[in-house]
Amino acid sequence: EVLALQEVSWDLLNRLNSAGIANYLPYSVAAQQTWHDNGGVNVLYSAAPMENAKQNLIPVESSSVSAATIDFGGSKVRFGSVHPFSPRPRNQGLWNRSLDSLAQLQHYDNLYVLMGDFNSTWDHASFRYLLGSRFLDSGQQAGEGLHMTYPAMMPIAEIDHIVHDKGVNVGDLETKYIAGSDHRALLATLEVA
């Protein structure tokens, strides 16, 4: 089990720790804080031990990408929690550069699963460029139609994604309302080929 959170405050981290998250997901890495943080930091939690945990996977002009490698029965998968800026007029350049930076992972050797608020839909050329010929969007692979995540109460946009290598297969994929969040959670069962 791997949980990726975005826009996490230090107060929320403390509350999660006090509530006993470590009893279920004892391994974690929080992204380093930067002036680019988009509402808070990105965090990864895992039930399995993490290897090569990093506070920032790749230089990106948005919230740092927390990342770690997890061994799935001999197959090592590199997970990342991502949150580029939204493509508002004042952030357009940062948003494009953030997605372009993430697209550079196509040239790395690891097997990747990137999870989070990409602030992008299939209508955005920058998101399609990020996927390139290597990565898939879990919603696309599941073949079940759109999984709207924003806004949480009456979602009209599919901006949260699980982006992964073609060597990872998606089983179940669903959205869940989480009280207090402005996005719905995106839950997936993944299998490593």
Regions found by a protein language model. Name each.
Residues L5-A193:
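Soluble catalytic domains of enzymes that build or remodel membrane lipids, polysaccharides, and related
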